[in-house]
Amino acid sequence: MGDNKNNYFDVIIIGSGSIGAPTALFLAQEGIKTLVIDKFPSVGQGSAKRAIGGIRATHSDPAKVRLCLRSIELFSQWQELYGDDIDWYKGGYTFVAYREEEEKTLKALIHKQKSLGLNINWLDKNDFLEVVPDINP
């Protein structure tokens, strides 16, 4: 029957989106035999394709924050590391507080996110208009 050694994998990843594909890449770089299974015919065709292409680390879960910070670091250096121009653009995200309760929640979250290494700030209306002057308040 031959050598079955090649029929086994150390890790099987379900999904080739924004989590599965880079996880497989890093595991393979470490010499870990990895298989990626996805219902779509090519990488990134599920929810990753429907995203706007941004990567944000503004989460409440510390593990997600760390993962996204690492993703930002990786994608910002992708061309230097792998030679492919992925049209990386360093942008930003804005979350608007329409009510006092939302403002309180977001301000509390900012402290947590800063403690995890995020470069994040609270902008009042005037500060925001300086950053994005063409917005219609």
Regions found by a protein language model. Name each.
Residues 3-19, 35:
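Beta1/beta-strand and adjacent pyrophosphate-binding region of the FAD-binding site
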Residues 3-6, 28, 88:
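Short, flexible hinge/linker loops that cap or flank conserved catalytic cores
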Residues 8-9, 31-32, 91, 118:
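Short coil/turn connectors at secondary-structure junctions
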Residues 26, 45, 85-87:
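Short secondary-structure boundary/capping segments within folded domains
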Residues 28-48:
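Glycine-rich FAD pyrophosphate-binding loop
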Residues 52-131:
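Dinucleotide-binding Rossmann-like beta1-alpha1 core, especially the glycine-rich loop
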Residues 134-137:
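Short, intrinsically disordered, charge-balanced linker/junction segments flanking boundaries
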